[in-house]
A protein has these predicted regions:
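Predominantly a Rossmann-like dinucleotide-binding segment in NAD(P)-dependent oxidoreductases
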Residues: 12-15, 145-248
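Beta-strand-loop-alpha-helix segment that lines the small-molecule cofactor/substrate pocket
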Residues: 79-80, 86, 91-147, 161
């Protein structure tokens, strides 16, 4: 099979980013290069794209530079476009790209893999989802927590019947930002709802997707959101000095409660409870604790890192309490060999790329028999709808 030809939108030459740390690390790995080939970069200007080509030592005769999505859309040598910009830039780039493909009439075999969130607001998301459906392009979105071997190991334990059916599940998360009062200047946009990238839309979105992928789609959802610290001092990451103070209009404390559907591993109307709080946990406590209370035992997942499962970084412990013996046992989990060779941020993201490859080469997919390959934009639309509804319900 020929490699899938990839164009990257938003690869910066000036600073490390999620696109370089996670996506590029996989794409340039030996395994990644067997399946994908980078053939183009698009940035906010042609010169910015050319600077990135030089920064990452790409061959300019192979990797083309573009300064607009319209120009990128004209490149017939591109199969898959990966958008890794900040969330408020996704919509403009992706809409113009899809409209460019539509205008040429050459949408067959084209695909887009966008980072999460898909766009700044639900209206933009719905427009992109509809346009993708109209043009028939393949889509993927960067919600990759479901691909974590921790989540897969939990699935194995549940299917084994060891703890019986899940009666309830609870998640407590403290973190997302390192400090409870101050934010880095570069993450100031977390305080502005209109940007679309904040604790709830990013951290909450990833977590809600992970939980629903593991346990089923939530119903009867209720919530309470609150801004505990509306005034947020911003700190220069280099000097450590406070540069200014801004007023936040995004929640920093969130409670969500819902019901889970019946399945082979979950009781009908089992309860799910989520609490997210910005800032570090109480000293000595894990930043992330996820419990699954079953009929015969309880699973406890914990980590000192609040988003370890999603990012693939940090230590994560799985423990099982057997009610009958009253003993607690730690359950081992591990990455696949090819993932261990990658930097931590690239491991779960690499699974999404593997899924894209399989989906584009159905023979391989059927032979390997994977149940889930990646989330598409329709799934992203459902996640965005829930996130937006809860924000509106709470007056945001």
């Amino acid at each position: 099979m020929a490699p899938i030809r990839v164009a990257l939108i938003g690869l910066s030459s000036s600073s490390p980013s999620w696109l370089s740390l996670a996506h590029l690390s996989y794409l340039l790995s030996a395994r990644g290069q067997q399946k994908f080939q980078i053939v183009a970069l698009q940035n906010s200007s042609l010169s910015a794209a050319e600077a990135a080509i030089k920064k990452y030592n790409f061959d300019p005769t192979v990797v083309k530079a573009y300064g607009s999505p319209e120009d990128l859309a004209k490149d017939e040598n591109v199969d898959l476009v990966v958008s890794g910009t900040r969330v408020d830039v996704h919509y403009g780039n992706l809409k113009r790209l899809l409209e460019g493909w539509k205008a040429t009439g050459k949408t067959a075999g084209k695909g887009v893999y966008s980072e999460w969130p898909l766009a700044s607001n639900l209206q933009q998301v719905e427009e992109l989802v509809a346009l993708a459906k109209e043009t028939g392009i393949k889509t993927a979105v960067g919600t990759q927590g479901w691909a974590s071997p921790v989540v897969k190991k939990i699935g194995e334990v549940l299917k084994s019947g060891r703890v019986g059916k899940v009666l309830s599940s609870e998640v407590r998360l403290s973190g997302v930002t390192a400090e409870r009062e101050v934010m880095q200047e570069k993450t100031e946009y977390f305080t502005r709802r209109e940007v679309g990238g904040n604790m709830w839309s990013i951290g909450g979105g990833h977590l809600i997707d992970l939980l629903q992928s593991a346990l089923g789609e939530l119903t009867n959802v209720k919530s309470h959101f609150h801004i505990q610290r509306p005034l947020v001092p911003l700190k220069d990451s280099t000097t450590g000095t406070i540069t200014r103070t801004v007023t936040s209009n995004t929640p920093d404390l969130l409670y969500v409660v819902g019901s889970l559907p019946a399945s082979d591993t979950v009781q009908q109307n089992a309860s799910l409870h989520l609490r997210m709080r910005r800032g570090p946990p109480f000293p000595g406590e894990p930043a992330f604790v996820w419990t699954l209370t079953g009929e015969k035992g309880e699973i406890r997942v914990s980590s000192k890192e609040s988003v370890a499962i999603i990012l693939g970084a940090g230590e994560v412990k799985i423990e099982i309490h057997d009610y009958q013996t009253d003993k607690v046992e730690e359950v081992e989990w591990k990455w696949e060999e090819w993932q261990e060779e990658l930097p931590a941020p690239a491991r779960n993201v690499g699974s999404v790329y593997e899924g894209v490859w399989e989906a584009w080469n159905e023979g391989i997919s059927k032979e390997e028999g994977r149940e889930k390959r990646y989330n598409d934009w329709e799934v992203a639309g459902r996640r965005h709808e829930l996130l937006e509804r809860l924000l509106v319900d709470n007056g945001f």
